C-alpha cells in the first residue's frame, strides 16, 4: 500500500508512491488545481519478475488533472524515485523516457492522447486547454528474486508552474 499526496490530500494506492504537488501561480493567471483521478497501481508483484504499468492502461496508470487559465503555458516537472522502500528494503523503479502522456482536448483519450511518449525526467512545457490537461504516468517495478514481501513506498513530486507565456 502506498500513498499519493495532492495539495495536502492523501490518496491510497497499491505498491507505490507518495505524490507531493507544488503549484506556482503567476499573478495574472488563475491558480491551478491538481487532482489525482487514478493512482499508479502495480498490484501484486512476484520475486524476480518485473511488472510494467503502461501509461495507456486505464485503472492502473496514474492520472492527474491540471486545471487553470486556458491558453496559458505551464511547466510540469516530475521528481521521480528510483526505488521504493519498506523498512530498509528497496525495490527498484524504472520510469522510461516514454512513460508519460498528456491530452488537453475536451474529451481526453488515454488510449490515443494528443501528446504521447513524453519523457517524465525532463521539464514538460504545455499550454492549458479549456479543460486543463490530463497527464498519465506509467512505470516499471523490478523486484529481486529474494525480495522481502510487504508494502513498499516512494515519493513522486509533481510541480506545475505558469511560465508567463
Which sequence ranges carry the predicted segments?
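Serine/threonine-rich, low-complexity intrinsically disordered segments
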Residues: 5, 125-127
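N-terminal secretory signal peptides that target proteins for export/translocation
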Residues: 1-8
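N-terminal small/polar-rich segments of proteins
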Residues: 29-91, 127-165
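Mid-chain, structured segments of secreted extracytoplasmic proteins
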Residues: 72-124
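Bacterial N-terminal signal peptides
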Residues: 12-26
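Compositionally biased, low-complexity segments
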Residues: 8-10, 96
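A detector of low-complexity, intrinsically disordered, Ser/Thr/Gly/Pro/Ala-rich segments
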Residues: 1, 31-33, 121-123
